[in-house]
Amino acid sequence: MQTLFLRKGLSGHTMAAIFIHDLIPNVLSAVLPDTSGFSVIDANRKAACCQGCFRCWLASPGQCVMKDDLQTVGAQIGTCKKVIILSRCCYGGFSPGVKKVLDRAISLSLPFFTYRSGRVHHPLRYQNRPTLTVCFYGAVTDFERETAMRLVEANRVNMGFSSVQVYFAEKPELMAEVIKNR
């Protein structure tokens, strides 16, 4: 099975769901056999890391200036109904590829400051508030599980998700039912 990376324009049209994953193709087909209704983002695909230049805030608001498959990932997340992330748990965080995708979504926010949940954050660029489901796989210690839960909650607040659910499993294939029901 070939993974297709769908790019969404900035037309304001809302995607139903975005599925961000770090799986190899045969495992992806076992977890998500039917990708219709999803914009699938393969975190293993070659794409540049965020350079921290903030030109997505200033030079091309809402869009990364690096012209690759992650150029509009912030707009995709900001205008969809739900985001599902399936990632190997790495020391209580996302895998490097999934983290790269989330780093490139910095254009979800604006270059100003505001208070949310009693803390200083950047205001959000989009009014839409998608739901977030995160499925971590791999052998995870209690400390890594606790760290991952805190990280995902911080991402929920910072990226403007309306709600979050987090799941853990030894193998990604065990998440197929969770993803199917999201």
Positions of the model-derived regions?
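Structural motif
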Residues: 19-24, 137-140, 168-170
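A structural preference for short, hydrophobic beta-strand core positions in alpha/beta folds
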Residues: 37-40, 163-168
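Short, glycine-/small-residue-rich phosphate/pyrophosphate-handling segment
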Residues: 112-162
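N-terminal beta1-alpha1-beta2 submodule of the flavodoxin-like/Rossmannoid cofactor-binding fold
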Residues: 1-83, 87-110, 157, 174-182
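Hydrophobic beta-strand segments of well-ordered beta-sheets in folded domains
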Residues: 13-18, 82-84, 126-135, 162-166
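A short, well-structured beta->alpha microelement
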Residues: 115, 168-174
